[in-house]
């Protein structure tokens, strides 16, 4: 990319000779993998200083300033001072010459036919009439913009103003910087902007604070409400409130920073949740004993879509060498003609489902990243050509469209998570896991994830409703001057709500996946106990005579062990010797089958197999329940014979984080802890950004490419 300096001292991030329409720049920005892009965002997020120059602000930096409450500092590029001053001086010179300029000597919007020579008073009136927001009572925060979104808006707005096209003094930008670095946040109304001619109403409250309007409050570092004077003092801004010069009020409010600032925060989370959904889909395949061929690169290469190819490659990487996949292969080889040939859509087509959502979120991210580095004022002050340009860069369809599209993608991700969760808790589909992931020995007093499944349906329903677009609900405003408008902030707000719901769904699903992992561990260890006990009892009652000699009609217990292998453990393990449960029924059927083949020998009590069935069953009923109970206690105390397979998988960092760092555990009816308490821990961790490191650790060995086709 080539750069040049314009007359305002700003550096342009495009070259008219080589890329006049900016398509190449847009395409270049999408190079590399989505995971690499997330890593860059996280790296930007964790830097202690954000150096602003007007053209290089990133999504990660906006998210950092928004959420760190002063822990990350902002520094303005001193090189920009001259360009900013030049545009400010141009406005003053123009007014001194009697030039008629919009927003300087004229009214605003549909009333721009009005004229005045009192430029300062005009700016004050602009701020006054735009202070039209409603905050509600002091105890009610539902009508206030979240302080994180306000911090994001402040950062984005003065990044735009730094480019030197807005006609505002550098000192005002320095004052806003002091507010940010001092963690002093203006109070902005949540509603009241259509994000065309910018976010006029909310931004007017930042301007109101700068000029000392009594109704413009701010919140201090400890959450205390501050008057304008208290805010200035705490921020260390000397010289008192600002007397706005001509154009400066318009420069402060005529921007899209509130919508694009919130969009930046939303997209930082959306990108993280998108990668999380890919990894969780792979874990879902592991615990469901899925067939990994759905990730084969040839399938996805033939479809050509990069999002799908990357989603499949990520899942392929997680599943490569997975201990669960190796074990599942043995399961699938047993009676293959009696099992489905392929997995259901929620597993098998997860790369095809998630791929387009990744592409949409990436495209939206780049669109918003361009937006937060753009100039949105009207008019634009072009010092080099000695003119003010009247246009419409405040028309923020990039925000509205990007957020509508992102919200639809988020809803689609949520729909897949819900489908996967529904299969996971349903014993008709989940390949042997207990119904609703019941973890205790008494399912009649343990209903596992039944409540969580109901909650997931609620989350998913609300999320699908939020997927509806905002931008098709435009109303003509401001005396039909603003007859089309973007609704960018409204769309950003709704997408923020959608992201929050997806966090709830992801938290619940992740807790359920960890429950399933532990249940597979329990299943494997208890099956060893069942097989060992059946084998020993069979040897004593079916193979050896009372005198210690081999029984004339003995048969190997191997066939009985095959019965145990074929039967889902959780279909009988709560009462393993119950006559109506499948284990005892099928063991008896196997013995009867052998007895029928025994022919004439069944007539003699010494050689009959049939006569020994009762003895076999009686001894098994005496021993097996005790052995199972003892094994459960040992496993709960961490003394299992077989270690948890998850430790041999690339998905282990996420499991370890949820279980060890967050302190969650296997949920059972005997324990007091509820599913919601465990989901809350994961939800809080996601909101605090703590899940990013274990998530990326799952992919630390991935080289950014699918496995070679072999």
UniProtKB/Swiss-Prot annotation:
Reactions performed catalytically: L-phenylalanine = (E)-cinnamate + NH4(+)
EC number: 4.3.1.24
CDD domains: PAL-HAL
Post-translational modification as stated in the protein's UniProt record: Contains an active site 4-methylidene-imidazol-5-one (MIO), which is formed autocatalytically by cyclization and dehydration of residues Ala-Ser-Gly.
UniProt keyword list: Cytoplasm, Lyase, Phenylalanine catabolism, Phenylpropanoid metabolism
2,3-didehydroalanine (Ser) PTM positions: 197
Protein's name according to its UniProt entry: Phenylalanine ammonia-lyase 1
Species for this entry: Rubus idaeus
């Amino acid at each position: 990319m080539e750069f040049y300096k314009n007359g305002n001292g700003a550096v342009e991030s495009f070259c008219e000779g080589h890329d006049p329409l900016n398509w190449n720049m847009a395409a270049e920005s999408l190079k590399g993998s989505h995971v690499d892009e997330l890593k860059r965002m996280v790296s930007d997020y964790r830097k202690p200083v954000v150096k602003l120059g007007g053209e290089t602000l990133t999504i990660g930096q906006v998210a950092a300033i928004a959420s760190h409450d002063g822990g990350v500092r902002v520094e303005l590029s001193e090189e920009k001072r001259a360009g900013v001053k030049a545009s400010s001086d141009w406005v003053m010179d123009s007014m001194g010459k009697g030039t008629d300029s919009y927003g300087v000597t004229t009214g605003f919007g549909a009333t721009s036919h009005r004229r005045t020579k009192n430029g300062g008073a005009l700016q004050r009136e602009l701020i006054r009439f735009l202070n039209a927001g409603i905050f509600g009572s002091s105890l009610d925060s539902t009508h206030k913009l979240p302080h994180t979104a306000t911090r994001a808006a402040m950062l984005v707005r003065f990044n735009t103003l730094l480019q030197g096209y807005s006609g505002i003094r550098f000192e005002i930008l320095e004052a806003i910087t002091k507010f940010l670095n001092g963690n002093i946040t203006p109070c902005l109304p949540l509603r009241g902007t259509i994000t065309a001619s910018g976010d006029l109403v909310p931004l007017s409250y930042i301007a109101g604070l700068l000029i000392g309007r009594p109704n413009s409050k701010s919140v201090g570092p400890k959450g205390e409400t501050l008057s304008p004077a208290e805010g200035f003092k705490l921020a260390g801004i000397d010289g008192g409130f600002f007397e706005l010069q001509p154009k400066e009020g318009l420069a402060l409010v005529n921007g899209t920073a509130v919508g694009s600032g919130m969009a930046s925060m939303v997209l930082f989370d959306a990108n993280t949740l998108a990668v999380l959904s890919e990894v969780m889909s792979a874990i879902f395949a592991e615990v469901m004993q899925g067939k990994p061929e759905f990730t084969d690169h040839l399938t996805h290469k033939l479809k050509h879509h990069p999002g799908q190819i990357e989603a499949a490659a990520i899942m392929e990487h997680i599943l490569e060498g997975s201990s669960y996949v190796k074990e599942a292969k043995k399961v699938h080889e047993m009676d293959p003609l009696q099992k489905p040939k392929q997995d259901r859509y929620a597993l098998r087509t997860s790369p095809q489902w998630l791929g387009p959502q990744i592409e949409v979120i990436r495209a939206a991210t780049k669109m918003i990243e361009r937006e937060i580095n753009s100039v949105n004022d009207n008019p634009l002050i072009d010092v080099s050509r000695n003119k003010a340009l009247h246009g419409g860069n405040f028309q923020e369809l990039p925000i509205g469209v990007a957020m509508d599209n992102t919200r639809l993608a988020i809803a689609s991700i949520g729909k897949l998570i819900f489908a996967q969760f529904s299969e996971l808790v349903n014993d008709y589909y989940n390949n042997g896991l207990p119904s609703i992931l019941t973890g205790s020995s008494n399912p009649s007093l343990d209903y596992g994830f039944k409540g969580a499944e109901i909650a997931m349906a609620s989350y998913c329903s609300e999320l699908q409703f939020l997927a509806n677009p905002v931008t098709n609900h435009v109303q003509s405003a401001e005396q039909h001057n603003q007859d089309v408008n973007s609704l960018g902030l409204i769309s950003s707000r709704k997408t923020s709500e959608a992201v929050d719901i997806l966090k709830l769904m992801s938290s619940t699903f992740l807790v359920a996946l960890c429950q399933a992992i532990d249940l597979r561990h329990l299943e494997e260890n208890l099956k060893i106990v069942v097989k060992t006990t059946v084998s020993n009892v069979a040897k004593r009652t079916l193979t050896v005579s009372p005198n210690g000699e081999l029984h004339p009609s003995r048969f190997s217990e191997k066939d009985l062990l095959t019965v145990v292998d074929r039967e889902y453990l959780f279909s009988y393990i709560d009462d393993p010797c119950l006559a109506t449960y499948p284990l005892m029924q099928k063991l008896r059927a196997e013995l009867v089958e052998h007895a029928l083949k025994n022919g004439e020998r069944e007539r003699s009590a010494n050689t009959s197999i049939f006569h020994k069935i009762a003895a076999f069953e009686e001894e098994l009923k005496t021993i097996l329940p005790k052995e199972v109970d003892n094994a459960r206690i040992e496993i709960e105390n961490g003394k299992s014979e077989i270690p948890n397979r998850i430790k041999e998988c690339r998905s282990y960092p996420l499991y370890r984080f949820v279980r060890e760092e967050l302190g969650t555990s296997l949920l059972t009816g005997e324990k007091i802890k509820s599913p919601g308490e465990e989901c809350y821990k994961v939800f809080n961790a996601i909101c605090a950004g703590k899940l990013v490191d274990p998530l990326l650790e799952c992919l630390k060995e991935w080289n950014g490419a699918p496995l070679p086709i072999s």
